Amino acid sequence: GHMSQCLSNSVLYNYHHLGDAASLTDGYHYDPSLKPYQVSADGKRSGTPDDMWAFTSRNPQLDLRASTMLAAASHALRGYNDDLAARALKQSKRLFKEANELMAKNPRPQGRGGMGGSNAATNLQLYVATGEKHYIEDFDAQIWSMLDMNVNFGISTALDAIPYMNDDYKTKLRPYVEKYKEYIDSLDEDNPYGVPIGLGNWAGSGNVVSFGTTVSFASQYFPDIISKDYAYKAMNYLFGCHPYHNYSLVATVGATRPKAVFYGNNRADFSFIPGNVAPGLLFRHPDHFENYDDWPFLWGQNEGTIAGNTSYVIF
């Protein structure tokens, strides 16, 4: 198997469905020979065309991301669930091999979205999971061109590698951290909060969380260059110091008042799930930020996601 490009609703009813996602479909495979709501005698098929659509065209970049995550999961699971750890590592290696074979047939430029950046992170996690030296050697050969192309994108992966590299690596990384420091200082000129505020169609608290995590590790390894105070800027923004209602964007956490309405599994109740992190303040051209706390269905402002919540836990 491989990563799917998309899993999508096939009918409008599914799209605006509220409540438990387990009831999104009837749980039967669609059979057009049956009438709507009719269930086959064997209890496996129905005449209701509500099956989800999986788009199965293969993107090796998605496979690399999956390989990275599976390798990291394998390392974390070892000693707790060894069978699952072994299965995760096996699939990580398989996806890594197959993705590289596919990309060799259709090469893409190095850098963000290209094989260089993705491979560096995957090689690092596979080394952590296996201890096999060829992975860390490949990582070391790839990370520097990745940083040269875009230090803001690559610095987090580079910092993750410090515990597994020698002192020469940290010395070589130092000027890149200094360059990253120039970027984070420039944020004070962009906005009064000193964090990367997104201006796209999806609100930008995810960028703020990632920024906070990166500067936290940078201050741990290079405290003479980057102060931990930068991480507090990210925390302040998430917990309410932002240009709208000053509510915390994290459910149940925050000094003034946490947001009480999120787009999640209980969105029909105009409620929240503790720990949800909202995308936050959506920029409306030409000069307005907004985050509605009385209407959950604007998912670009209010949706709590697994990826976003996990990133916050790490931060």
Residue spans of the language-model regions?
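Active-site acid/base region of carbohydrate-active enzymes
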Residues: G1-R45, Y80-F96, N100-G114
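Acidic, Ser/Thr-rich low-complexity linear motifs
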Residues: R108-G113, Y193-N201
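Aromatic-lined, polymer-binding surfaces characteristic
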Residues: N59, D63, S67-L77, A85-T130, ...
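Aromatic (Trp/Tyr) and acidic
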Residues: N9-R65, M69, A120-H134, D138-A141, ...
